[in-house]
Amino acid sequence: QDSGFSIPDVIQTDAAINPGNSGGPLLNMKGQVVGINTAIQSTSGGNSGIGFAVPSNTAIKIVPSLIEDGEYHHPWIGISGRDIDPDLARVLELKDAKGFLIITVVDGSPADKAGLKGMTATQVIDGKEYPADGDIIISVDDKEVRKISDILIHLQREKSVGDAMTL
């Protein structure tokens, strides 16, 4: 089932992950744990050769909270949108095709409290609908943002709930 949440730095593997054995270790050729088997890509519900594991360094960050509180609260911003591709950059008259255009901001989210703005209008060019406005994130804590995954990876690696972040 798609939860809508993506796992930054997820490891793709061909190791068999079937119902009942997720949560097991993913080992490298030296027998070292590099991840925790988590999910499969399947239309039948069984292993079809594509599995995914949470990296062990991510698990190390999360496990103490799970042991202590029984849950882990992920840092989040509260936005959805789209990466700036060359077509969108042209339409928005941007110099570079990089960054993340905010389409929606979740009410009450950190993004909402910070005053970030989502899209409020669209424009049609050559029969294709494009966003006409909305804030564009081009950096996070002085690191360049080329796409949403740059933001998600930064949140996962560097931030905890309640931490400030400069966009």
Predicted regions and their residues:
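C-terminal recognition in membrane/secretory proteostasis and scaffolding
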Residues: A15, N28-M29, V33, T58-L167
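Active-site loop architecture of trypsin-fold serine endopeptidases
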Residues: Q1-G23, M29-H74
